[in-house]
From Swiss-Prot:
One of its GO terms (molecular function) is GTP binding. Regulated by guanine nucleotide exchange factors (GEFs) which promote the exchange of bound GDP for free GTP. Regulated by GTPase activating proteins (GAPs) which increase the GTP hydrolysis activity. Inhibited by GDP dissociation inhibitors (GDIs). Keywords: Cytoplasmic vesicle, Golgi apparatus, GTP-binding, Hydrolase, Lipoprotein, Magnesium, Membrane, Metal-binding, Nucleotide-binding, Prenylation, Protein transport, Transport. Mg(2+) binds at T78, T97, D120. A lipid is attached at C254, C255 (S-geranylgeranyl cysteine). Its cofactor is Mg(2+). It is found in: Cytoplasmic vesicle, Secretory vesicle membrane; Golgi apparatus membrane. It is a lipid-anchor. Interacts with ADRA2B. Interacts with RIMS1. Expressed in pancreas, kidney, brain, submandibular gland, and lung. The gene is Rab26. GO terms for biological process: exocrine system development; Golgi to plasma membrane protein transport; regulated exocytosis; regulation of exocytosis; regulation protein catabolic process at presynapse; vesicle-mediated transport. CDD domains: Rab26. This is Ras-related protein Rab-26.
Length: 257
């Protein structure tokens, strides 16, 4: 298999195939509409197949996918991304993301180099129109809430409705309860997150950008799911995202720092 080198220019994407489920016992979402047309991706946007590398980062890859982090402002999207990409924690004063930003990381998934181009979106309402344009070609979405902020959890349903309207029907979606290291400030029970995820048929885990708990697991699970969707041979056993998340995340202490 020939390998590409991470381009800095925009391009197309590798298709995925799954459906965002409606709630089983909760309010049923409308059937997803075709994603609305938006502006062209910026020069450093998602890599397109068949495009030559125009600049070197030294990261060769076999297949690339676009992943978006979404959720209310302040839930820790940027910190989660920095923890995954750089293995560091952004301590100190909180600064909201303005507009949208992205970083690349190449993972070795079952012998294949998988590049995730991860887009960090602003959660504030005034940036929503910008964010909507980026849903259309996203292969996966990580939807975050803050376990110390009840409003961010209550707003998950509104985010799901927005995703249903603007994202592709086959997008991979995972729910994350972030800041699990803040045990003393917790106001959203783990059971509440599990219940909501079950209603919508979503894989779920709690994460901590501060300690790194389940951060790599979340992105690795997404990469495995997307990789198999794009390359699965008829004889290859199906990768089960829900089972993988439950198995790999089980027994991990949320207080381990």
């Amino acid at each position: 298999m020939s390998r590409k080198k991470t381009p800095k220019s925009k391009g197309g994407s590798v298709p995925a195939a799954s459906t965002l489920p409606a709630a089983a016992n909760g309010p049923r979402l409308a059937h997803p509409r075709t994603a609305r047309p938006g502006p062209e991706a910026p020069p450093n946007g998602p890599p397109q197949s068949g495009r030559p590398s125009l600049g070197g980062t030294g990261d060769f890859y076999d297949v690339a996918f676009k992943v978006m982090l979404v959720g209310d402002s302040g839930v820790g999207k940027t910190c989660l991304l920095v923890r995954f990409k750089d293995g560091a924690f952004l301590a100190g004063t909180f600064i909201s993301t303005v507009g949208i930003d992205f970083r690349n990381k190449v993972l070795d998934v079952d012998g294949m180099k998988v590049k995730l181009q991860i887009w960090d979106t602003a959660g504030q309402e005034r940036f929503r129109s910008v964010t909507h344009a980026y849903y259309r070609d996203a292969h996966a979405l990580l939807l975050l809430y803050d376990i110390t902020n009840k409003d961010s959890f209550d707003n998950i349903q509104a985010w799901l409705t927005e995703i249903q309207e603007y994202a592709q029907q086959d997008v991979v979606l995972m729910l994350l309860g972030n800041k699990v290291d803040s045990t003393q400030e917790r106001v959203v029970k783990r059971e509440d997150g599990e219940k909501l995820a079950k209603e919508y048929g979503l894989p779920f885990m709690e994460t901590s950008a501060k300690s790194g708990l389940n951060v790599d697991l979340a992105f690795t699970a997404i990469a495995k799911e997307l990789k198999q969707r794009s390359t699965k041979a008829p004889s290859e056993p199906r990768f089960r995202l829900h089972d993988y998340v439950k198995r790999e995340g089980r027994g991990v202490s949320c207080c381990r720092l």
